[in-house]
Amino acid sequence: MRVMLDNGIFGHSQFAESVLGPQGPRFGIHDQDNQVWGFVRKTLDPDREYQSQIDALFTVGRLIREKRIEAFTYCELMFESFNRVIGETAFDAFAGCARSDCPPALMRSRFRGGDGFAFARKGGKKDRKRGLDTGLSQIDFMEWLCTLDDRHIAAILECNAILGLTEFEIGSLRNLSCFQRLCAISQSQENYPDMFHLWTAQRNRMDVFLTLEKKLTQIFKHIEHARIIEIEHQTTVLRPLEFLRLLGVAEPDPVPIEPGRFYPAHEFMKLPQWVGK
């Protein structure tokens, strides 16, 4: 099964943070301490349902390692990850999981380029509130795509050789009305990047777009009920627990790191091989 993983999936796959362990008796002529580095579990989300979705990522990771799932990402999702703090690799639900890259429906750099940091921005409310330049952002590009009609698309295709469009991207331009309708149904420019992810997943014939965000699954259900979009390949948007039920997994694997417990780093190496490797 081909599954595209949303940026938030990776952002919540790291369950531990490194800390200095509790102080024991001091020793030696220099009154040395015997604290050691180790790991504790990150603070649980106050929304228990949301936390249960996060906990299910360990099972998703196992299924990827067992090759029951083929996991994918792509450049626009990776740009979003630039705003994410790199977490601790110990107790990572996706440790040892293979991920493949797929092409975006349209490569933004074919149409615009510039400062890398500006290019990686989403361009949403938070960026605008901070006074950041959003002219090269995801949302700005996607707003532009929504303004294109058949005449514009024909003109772009005439410049194919100059732009270096691939056959895949030419197919996307001819399918652009699908993306435009997705954006219209999403009802907010803040949702345009998610609609681009879904469109890219459809163009790459993904079976599932996996996300933690309930809002995105609700938009997808609205799209299904609307039945006004001609989609070349149906990609289902699911959260982790729904996805596991689809695969026949009734009970997710237990999370191998307990809240409130300290795991010394040297003891971590003795844990089951699939954890953190």
Regions found by a protein language model. Name each.
Residues 1-204, 215-277:
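Active-site-proximal, substrate-binding regions of enzyme catalytic domains
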